[in-house]
């Protein structure tokens, strides 16, 4: 894959060649640097800093979550990067190369496969763009951390499968949203 670099004036500055065939995502971390998530030749997901001056990939980080193409990376909450996967939202630490789960999409009555972007606000709320492939509807969702004891109890469907289809997951989420 080829990453083209442009300056703040919009002028082409050069390119960075990667050995990856599939880029997972890219974004700016808390440190103001831009990072690239991608598959390496062994199929593992890696994270590398983009060195704009050297026109190369910089330091590489391991144990990065697979974003399954939902790869809009942005500044983290407590750590460096907020990382969206199809099951959860994570805060990733560059120093420790570890993730901390921020939330489970299903626990928030959201089909994580439909989340195309997520970010944190300055006051700690989570904003997510949710694009429902089945209905064509797109929502901007704002999530606020709430203690489990403060959440109204309701009936929910839990489905255990080896692989869950998107339509089955969407049906369970829809039921869970509407149940009392």
Tell me the role of every PLM-derived stretch.
Residues 2-4, 42-49, 86-93, 134-142:
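Structural motif
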Residues 18-31, 65-78, 110-121:
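Repeated scaffold domains used in trafficking and secretory/extracellular systems
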Residues 6-11, 51-55, 94-97:
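Short loop/turn segments that connect beta-strands within beta-propeller blades
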Residues 11-17, 56-64, 100-109:
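A short beta-strand motif characteristic of beta-propeller blades
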Residues 153-165, 180:
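Short, well-ordered beta-strand elements
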């Amino acid at each position: 894959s080829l990453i083209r670099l442009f300056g703040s004036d919009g002028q082409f500055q050069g390119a960075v060649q990667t050995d990856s065939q599939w880029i997972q995502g890219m974004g700016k971390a808390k440190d103001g640097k831009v990072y690239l998530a991608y598959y390496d030749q062994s199929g593992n997901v890696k994270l590398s800093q983009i060195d704009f001056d050297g026109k190369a990939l910089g330091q590489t980080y391991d144990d990065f979550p697979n974003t399954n193409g939902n790869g809009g990376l942005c500044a983290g909450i407590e750590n460096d990067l907020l990382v969206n996967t199809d099951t959860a939202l994570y805060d990733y630490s560059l120093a420790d190369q570890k993730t901390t789960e921020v939330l489970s999409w299903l626990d928030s009555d959201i089909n994580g496969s439909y989340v195309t972007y997520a970010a944190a606000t300055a006051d700690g709320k989570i904003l997510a763009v949710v694009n429902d492939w089945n209905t064509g509807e797109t929502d901007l969702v704002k999530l606020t951390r709430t203690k489990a004891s403060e959440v109204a109890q309701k009936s929910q469907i839990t489905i255990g499968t080896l692989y869950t289809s998107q339509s089955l997951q969407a049906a369970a989420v829809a039921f869970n949203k509407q149940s009392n």
